[in-house]
Amino acid sequence: NPKKRVYVVEGPIDSLFLKNSVAMVGAGALKEIPKRLENTPMSYILDNEPRNRQICSYIEKLIELGGDVCIWPDIIPEKDINDLAYRMSTRRIQKMIDENTFNGLEATLRFREWRKV
């Protein structure tokens, strides 16, 4: 539903656990998804891999573009939504993502604390 916030996740399986979500597949997704969902509020949820240079690069780029990005809290050891679903309800996952989604300066500060690269 493009009238509601769309959750852009890294993989197709992750998209099964969130309402109104779409999987970011392929290198062009960072440019194509915003074009297709113009004027739609979006949150980007990438995998919880603070040592992965590619993920860190994507997050940094999304923040620079003014995107809303989920910065995983330190208490979450799981790598992605799929893994998290084994121990947490989808409602709780959605709430946690909403509470840890930031943009602008706050996103930059949280990202710097989160990344390990």
Where are these regions (language model features)?
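TOPRIM fold recognition
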Residues: K3-V6, P12-V117
